[in-house]
């Protein structure tokens, strides 16, 4: 069917569309979506952003709730103080990430995780655009 097609309409994210382009060099490929985030399906037609692929995962000490993604300000050392009724001051439709993190850590008896001051995130580790190779590097011959 692809051979007969004049073009390809990709329903994938931007990465998926680019993968198709690399494999179908003789056909135009058009994206049907504007990728805004890496997310999860909440329910049909509703999605939640889950990861910004920052290169320094914070989930181990935050009880599995990402402050980089879930906090509108990307704060790493606790809430900004602007939340009202558990909602984010930047977008009141969203729960405050730090209230969620606090509640989660309390429920798993790990509130001590909040005592350490976190250094600013090193976003250079995300190094956009990135590539990844799973091939083993050949050992360099020693002279």
Predicted features by range, described:
Residues 1-8, 22-35, 39-61, 65-143:
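Iron-sulfur (Fe-S) cluster-binding modules
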Residues 16-18:
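Short, well-ordered alpha-helical microsegments
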Residues 10-14:
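N-terminal glycine-rich "phosphate-gripper" loop used for MgATP/nucleotide binding
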């Amino acid at each position: 069917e692809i051979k007969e097609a004049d073009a390809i309409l990709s329903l994938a994210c931007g990465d998926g569309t680019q993968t198709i382009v690399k494999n179908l060099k003789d056909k135009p490929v058009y994206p049907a979506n504007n990728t805004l985030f890496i997310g999860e399906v909440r329910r049909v037609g509703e999605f939640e952003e889950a990861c910004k692929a920052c290169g320094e995962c914070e989930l181990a000490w935050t009880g599995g709730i990402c402050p980089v993604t879930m906090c509108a300000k990307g704060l790493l050392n606790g809430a900004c103080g602007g939340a009202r009724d558990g909602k984010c001051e930047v977008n009141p439709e969203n729960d405050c990430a730090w209230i969620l993190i606090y509640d989660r850590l309390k429920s798993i008896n790990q509130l001590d995780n909040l005592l350490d001051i976190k250094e600013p995130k090193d976003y250079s580790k995300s190094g956009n655009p990135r590539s990844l190779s799973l091939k083993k590097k050949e050992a360099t011959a020693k002279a």
